[in-house]
């Protein structure tokens, strides 16, 4: 009898021990619900922040930015710049391997920068690297990069998430298909990419930082509908969600299992107007449209207060000495109608308004803007695009074939400095498909000021040049600047170390599930 009790006790103890072991070794799998799909897993060929953010699962750069957008070393240990501003010498960390076993060294850096700076490769991010004359591997841990001309923002180019280090072995093996076969030095490696549904990454056992990563897997799942994204958090289907529907922020805040985060951003939302096409070639029309939009009302209707009306073309938090603020456009539909009449459009006109995203917040902005424009006689046919449509119809077409007229989108300067907040959007050479000047704006003075600002390291001179460029842009109004967003994300309280960067990218290297 005693033996029977003893055996049953052992069985019970065994079951309990097994359960405890099961709990102790339960897989740490995290699902992240994001607002749109991914275009590619090749960061050098992606124009959208989300694709580059997900690519950080696999890839790392020489340098990066911390939460305060300050420079930090990643795969590099240090750098020096020659007195003439032409040569950058970078010292690399030792003992790091790519996920395919290839050594990370100066030869690997050269392979990546040679690829990025070669126009024959037709990479979307070529413009970041076109000033590189040559890259040399001096020894295994020393790289020398020589520029064609002084470029004071170059170290910030190496900070940009596009400047990821890809295994040269993988580059040679996969060629143009590298976007489907990512191989980097990052904490995770690709498990599955279902292009219509999700990207799943798994822990890279050979990661060079001890004790990391702490998660076993991350599944990045595009969910266009804001409400569905929030619901996934509440049901436990997702552990992190961004962006959070602003109107649901208060509700989520009350959930004891969820933590809501609202943080500052460098994401500016705006509507560009194609100034090469009628009626947007007329400055009075562009001025009228700026008067036609009630920005404080837009902040309430579409962003539930989690944004501020834009007061310039560069968000104030980017390179504060260079970002200029102006008197906000007042809402004045009467003035808008007067200007339209002066421009030869007393009865308004018809046009198209496209959006670079199709999530619920973008839909609200489109509807609000459509109604506002209608009040001054402008009939706008709206289209909310997914990532594939945007890449094909906006990013992939030049001025002559482009159907862009009015285009609602956003930009965050992921280099953390002023040039990348201005040149890709306003320089004449950066019309699509080169970069993202979707207004097809061109002004020689602006081009000259932006170019001169990159040739000086004098902060006072930079301030003068960037101010002069912004003054002209603000006066000529190729945009309707709308708002600077606050970033609202939410996560399960048992998820730590996972947060949103000011440029809307993700930081998750230290993420853990308790």
From Swiss-Prot:
InterPro entries: Peptide/Ni-bd, SBP_5, SBP_5_CS, SBP_5_dom. One of its GO terms (cellular component) is ATP-binding cassette (ABC) transporter complex. GO terms for molecular function: peptide transmembrane transporter activity. Keywords: Periplasm, Signal, Transport. Residues 1-26 form the signal peptide. Pfam families: SBP_bac_5. GO terms for biological process: dipeptide transport. The complex is composed of two ATP-binding proteins (GsiA), two transmembrane proteins (GsiC and GsiD) and a solute-binding protein (GsiB). Belongs to the bacterial solute-binding protein 5 family. PANTHER family: GLUTATHIONE-BINDING PROTEIN GSIB, PERIPLASMIC BINDING COMPONENT OF ABC TRANSPORTER. This is Glutathione-binding protein GsiB. It comes from Shigella flexneri serotype 5b (strain 8401).
């Amino acid at each position: 009898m005693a033996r029977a009790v003893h055996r049953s006790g052992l069985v019970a103890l065994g079951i309990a021990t097994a359960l405890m072991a099961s709990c102790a070794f339960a897989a740490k799998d995290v699902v992240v619900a994001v607002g749109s799909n991914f275009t590619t897993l090749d960061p050098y060929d992606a124009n959208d922040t989300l694709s580059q953010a997900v690519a950080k699962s696999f890839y790392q750069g020489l340098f990066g930015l911390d939460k305060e957008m300050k420079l930090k070393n990643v795969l590099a240990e240090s750098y020096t710049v020659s007195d003439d501003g032409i040569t950058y010498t970078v010292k690399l960390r030792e003992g790091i391997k790519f996920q395919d076993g290839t050594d990370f060294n100066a030869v690997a850096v050269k392979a990546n920068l040679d690829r990025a700076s070669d126009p024959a490769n037709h990479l979307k991010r070529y413009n970041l690297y076109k000033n590189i004359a040559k890259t040399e591997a001096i020894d295994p841990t020393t790289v020398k990069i020589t520029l064609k001309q002084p470029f004071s923002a170059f170290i910030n180019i190496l900070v940009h998430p596009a400047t990821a280090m890809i295994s040269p072995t993988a580059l040679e093996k996969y060629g143009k298909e590298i976007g489907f076969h990512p191989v980097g030095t990052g904490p995770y490696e690709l498990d599955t990419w279902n292009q219509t549904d999700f990207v799943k990454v798994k822990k890279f056992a050979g990661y060079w930082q001890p004790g990391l990563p702490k998660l076993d897997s991350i599944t990045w799942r595009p969910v266009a509908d804001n409400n569905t994204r929030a619901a996934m958090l509440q049901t436990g289907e997702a552990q992190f969600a961004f962006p959070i529907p602003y109107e649901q922020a208060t509700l989520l805040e009350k959930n004891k299992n969820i933590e809501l985060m609202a943080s500052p951003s460098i994401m500016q939302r705006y509507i560009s107007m194609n100034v090469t096409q009628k009626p947007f070639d007329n400055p009075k029309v562009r001025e009228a449209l700026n008067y036609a939009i009630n920005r404080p009302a837009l902040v309430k209707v579409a962003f539930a207060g989690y944004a501020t009306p834009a007061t310039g073309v560069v968000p104030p938090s980017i390179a504060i000495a260079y970002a200029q603020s102006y008197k906000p456009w007042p809402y004045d539909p009467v003035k808008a109608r007067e200007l339209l009449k002066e421009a030869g459009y007393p009865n308004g006109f018809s046009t198209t308004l496209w959006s670079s995203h199709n999530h619920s917040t973008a839909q609200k902005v489109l509807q609000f803007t459509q109604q506002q424009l209608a009040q001054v006689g402008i009939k706008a046919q709206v289209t909310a695009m997914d990532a594939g449509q945007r890449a094909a119809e906006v990013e992939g077409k030049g001025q002559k074939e482009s159907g862009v007229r009015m285009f609602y989108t956003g930009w965050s300067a992921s280099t953390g400095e002023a040039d990348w907040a201005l040149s890709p959007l306003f320089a004449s050479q950066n019309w699509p498909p080169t970069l993202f000047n979707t207004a097809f704006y061109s002004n020689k003075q602006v081009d000259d000021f932006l170019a001169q600002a990159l040739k000086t390291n004098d902060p006072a001179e930079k301030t003068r040049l960037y101010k002069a460029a912004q003054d002209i842009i603000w006066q000529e109004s190729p945009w309707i600047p709308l708002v600077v967003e606050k970033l609202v994300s939410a996560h399960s309280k048992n998820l730590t170390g996972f947060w949103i960067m000011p440029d809307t990218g993700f930081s998750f290297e230290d993420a853990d599930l308790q």
